[in-house]
């Protein structure tokens, strides 16, 4: 990554540096670290990285995975001059993963995880057949726990009534 570029439009989930300098076999390099310096982002625009991650995906399947969660997927693709959130290329990578799984292991389900507004979250269903089979919803677990513990589902019901189904 080039620290001289303008990254002001990039959505930041944390108030930590977006780029971190690391010592590599090629000398010092700046790497993209969306969440923190201990979590380096992968460059999915590099075909070698993309193919390696597809191999990792299939290795999970080989070892019995039935559900695969794509954590913070909205941040996957980097494009200077954008928010770097929910870019078309990100959806294309999810579609590619789904296509690979449909061929190699159709029983395996993809779950996308994005802590974002509902409509952005459900965009990872794609057309209903080409992206994730499930999207993780951050509001649902605490509201469900609250309803069970309080024996009162009013907050859960109120929240659910405001959700637009993906088919709408």
Residue ranges and their predicted role:
Residues 41-121, 125-129, 142, 146-147:
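Active-site neighborhood of glycoside hydrolase catalytic domains
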Residues 1-9, 103-168:
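Conserved alpha/beta catalytic core and glycan-binding cleft of carbohydrate-active enzymes
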Residues 20-38, 89-95, 123-139:
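Short, charge-rich amphipathic segments
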Residues 1-63, 76-78, 82:
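Substrate-binding/active-site clefts of carbohydrate-active enzymes
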């Amino acid at each position: 990554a080039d620290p001289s570029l303008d990254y002001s439009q990039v959505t930041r989930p944390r108030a930590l540096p977006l780029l971190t300098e690391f010592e590599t076999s090629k000398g010092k390099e700046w790497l993209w670290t969306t969440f923190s310096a201990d979590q380096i982002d992968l460059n999915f625009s590099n075909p070698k990285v993309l193919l390696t991650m597809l191999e990792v995906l299939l290795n999970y399947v080989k070892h019995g995975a039935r559900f695969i969660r794509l954590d913070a997927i909205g941040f996957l693709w980097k494009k200077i001059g954008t928010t770097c959130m929910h870019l078309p290329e990100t959806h294309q990578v999810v579609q590619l993963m789904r296509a690979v799984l449909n061929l190699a292991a159709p029983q395996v389900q993809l779950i996308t995880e994005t802590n974002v507004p509902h409509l952005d979250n459900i965009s990872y269903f794609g057309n209903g057949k080409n992206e994730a089979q499930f999207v993780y919803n951050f509001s649902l677990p605490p509201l469900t726990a609250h309803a069970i513990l309080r024996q009162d589902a009013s907050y859960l019901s109120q929240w659910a009534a405001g959700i637009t189904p993906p088919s709408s």
